[in-house]
A protein has these predicted regions:
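Mixed-charge interfacial surface used for oligomerization/domain docking
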Residues: 2-5, 11-19, 23-33, 94-97, ...
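Glycine-rich phosphate- or other oxyanion-binding loops that anchor nucleotides, phosphorylated ligands
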Residues: 55-106, 148, 152
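Hydrophobic residues in alpha-helical segments
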Residues: 53-54, 78, 142, 175
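Aromatic side chains
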Residues: 38, 49-50, 70, 98, ...
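Short alpha-helical interface patches
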Residues: 46-54, 72-74, 157, 214, ...
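Short acidic, glycine/Ser/Thr-rich loop/turn "cap" segments at secondary-structure junctions
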Residues: 86-89, 119-123
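Intrinsically disordered, low-complexity regions enriched in small/polar residues
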Residues: 40, 44, 51, 72, ...
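N-terminal glycine-rich anion-binding loop in soluble enzyme alpha/beta folds
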Residues: 4-64, 69
């Protein structure tokens, strides 16, 4: 009989109220400019984090999940009888989290050469609910009695076909985090341009620029419809509740179905996109 557990990081943006039976979420540590440190999900709410972003001069720093924290979690799960552990990480191109997980696995087997546990480390190649949603479904699959291999295959196929469209109503954070150049941000702010960005397999690309706040949501929805062959299955995310509500009702009206989920975007996206940003996660055709 299998006893399968999943470890992921708080970049997954799985809602705090989601009741998952087989998933452990390790929070990123966030350090603000006043030197305070918080573990995401556990010490600080997203809303409080957005308030910090609103007033900060220097962007908070986020630390990856360390090898030691993974090692401790693996040991605890094995002690509790886990036969299979699947570790899902945020896109490894943007964080040392994946490498830390791989290292923790190696060290665990060096120290426990006779252990029969299976440990699989998966780079989601993604951000936010683009890996959080598949992890939520994998939790259900564990409850339904699927094998570890079925769950790993499912996760890999989901990660291969999720994308996120994102836009920000203020360019301050994209400029500070280097997502867009200072020159582009300056020109954009001068002309009232807002970037529409696609996050795909770890790559972030500006696919369109629109003029004025009113054009952001229609452009996001238009890009979404062009990029998916499954417009009924999507999730929206936001760092600003008012814009989130606007996006929700515009999507429902335009697509005929509400999103599967509406979530607050956590620190991994919010730090780079800012506290006035919105996004849509969806599936591509592959």
């Amino acid at each position: 009989l299998y006893n399968i557990k999943i470890i992921t990081d708080s970049g997954c943006d799985i809602p705090v109220k989601a009741k998952l039976k087989n998933v452990e979420i390790l929070g990123f540590y966030i350090t603000t400019e006043d030197g305070k440190s918080y573990e995401e999900r556990y010490d600080i709410t997203n809303k409080k984090y957005y308030k910090i972003l609103e007033s900060c001069t220097n962007i908070p720093k986020t630390a990856h999940i360390t090898m030691m924290r993974y090692g401790e979690k693996i040991e605890a799960l094995v002690r509790d009888g886990a036969t299979d552990i699947i570790i899902v990480t945020i896109n490894k191109g943007a964080s040392a989290t994946y490498d830390a997980a791989v290292m923790a696995k190696t060290i665990f087997f060096d120290e426990n050469p006779d252990s029969k546990v299976n440990i699989e480390v998966l780079d989601s190649n993604a951000y936010s609910v683009a890996y959080g949603w598949p992890v939520m479904q994998a939790d259900k699959m564990i409850e339904e009695g699927h094998t570890p291999q079925q769950i790993i295959s499912y996760l890999k196929s989901e990660f291969a076909r999720t994308q996120i469209l994102l836009s920000a109503y203020t360019l301050k954070f994209m400029k500070k985090s280097g997502r867009i150049s200072a020159a582009a941000a300056f020109a954009g702010e001068l002309m009232g341009l807002k970037p529409i960005i696609v996050m795909d397999h770890g790559d972030t690309t500006v696919v369109q620029k629109v003029r004025g706040d009113k054009m952001v949501i229609p452009a996001l929805i238009r890009q979404f419809k062009e990029r998916t062959n499954d417009p009924k299955h999507y999730i929206i995310g936001y760092t600003d509740e008012e814009y989130g509500k606007e996006l929700y009702s515009a999507c429902e009206k335009e697509l005929g179905v509400p999103p599967m989920l509406a979530i607050e975007l956590g620190s991994a996206v919010a730090t780079n996109a800012g506290n006035h940003s919105i996004g849509i996660m969806y599936y591509t055709g592959e």
